[in-house]
Structure formats: C-alpha cells, structure tokens
Amino acid sequence: MPPMERWDFLAMRVRCALYADDPRAIDHLFTMGGYLHEQGDACAWDVARKTAMLLMDTAEDTALPWQWRCQCLDHVARPLGVMQHIGRMSDAPPHLSSEYRRITQALLQRLSRLEIHRESW
C-alpha cells in the first residue's frame, strides 16, 4: 500500500475508533505522518493540520467511546506543537503564523463546546 494511502487508512481507523482499545493507533498515525514528510510525500504543516483536525473531530464525536475521545483530545497538542514550531521558523512563510493562530482559536472554540462525559458503568 502506498504511504499516503496507508496514512489515510490509519486516519480512518482513528476517526472511526476501530481499535479504541489500542492507543498505539494514534502513535502509528503520527509515525506514518512523519514518514510521509521525510519521504517528501507531504509537508509537515499539512500533516500536522490534518492530524489536529482529525483528532478534534474524533474527540467531538459522541457516537464514539468516551475513552477513545479522551485519548484523541489528549493527543491534539502534539500536531499543534509541530505547527507552532514550523510557524516560528525564520524561513517559514509569514501566513503560517497567522494560520496557526486561526486554527488554534478555532480549536479553542470547539473545546469550549466539547462535552466528554464518562458513561455510567
């Protein structure tokens, strides 16, 4: 399977909580995203942005198990950190810094509306 298809497949597994009992699924997604960047198949900014949005979308999905939603929410900071680092680099295009601020503001608004309740056992 080509690397980009593999990354899309891993993203689908995370988004649909297909392996909700295996938190390594999120780590595999990060690993494959790094591989795509290293091989020149995708830029780090795009991988980080898509990953952050995927994790936030998953965290907001009330149809998924709460523990999986919490795992995704816990991991959102990682791609945001990558985006912040790229935006602060001296050779980064100026629009990336403002795009980072726009994305983080949008995520903060989404977080303020997010409700993750643990279902009763």
Label the predicted regions.
Residues P2, G40, P65, M89-A92:
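Alpha-helix capping and helix-coil boundary motifs
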Residues A17, L36-C43:
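Hydrophobic/aromatic side-chain positions at a characteristic register within alpha-helices
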